[in-house]
């Protein structure tokens, strides 16, 4: 009887360990989130007129394990509603040579994926456009949802910081400051390793 109790306890212990191992999350699964259809907008203006460029082709990844944040948009997918203005924008940005605007950096604030409320977060890294990179810090909100992560952020870009000459007509120039907004839902990346 003593041996059967030992075996029974060993089986129970092994079963308990197996259950615990099954419910411990694997680091890479559920820690990485990916989108290919995020939304980006930028607002700009000339005297007496403003306009917005929009793309729903923002590609991005957030890896909570490593705190990696990487987003980019092909500038050819940004539309302002006027074809000539779109072509002028691409020419100004030298998009044939530098087609992407990208942010690559780290989440530098705390984020609790167990909390389902929007949380203020801060990222820091390199933003690159027009072939020029600058270190920037961006504040936004990140929320864990049933679909994955929901991100919203905005910041202001100064074209001079990226060697972009604001286009203009006659005496009017586009404002050097561009307001940028992004929003995206990032489902879990089930192919993460």
Regions found by a protein language model. Name each.
Residues 4, 25-30:
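Residues marking helix boundaries in flexible regions
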Residues 14-27:
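Bacterial N-terminal signal peptides
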Residues 2-15:
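Bacterial N-terminal signal peptides that target proteins for export
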Residues 29-193:
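Low-complexity, acidic/polar, glycine-enriched regions of mature
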Residues 1-2, 17, 108-111:
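Short regulatory "switch" loops immediately downstream of catalytic or recognition motifs
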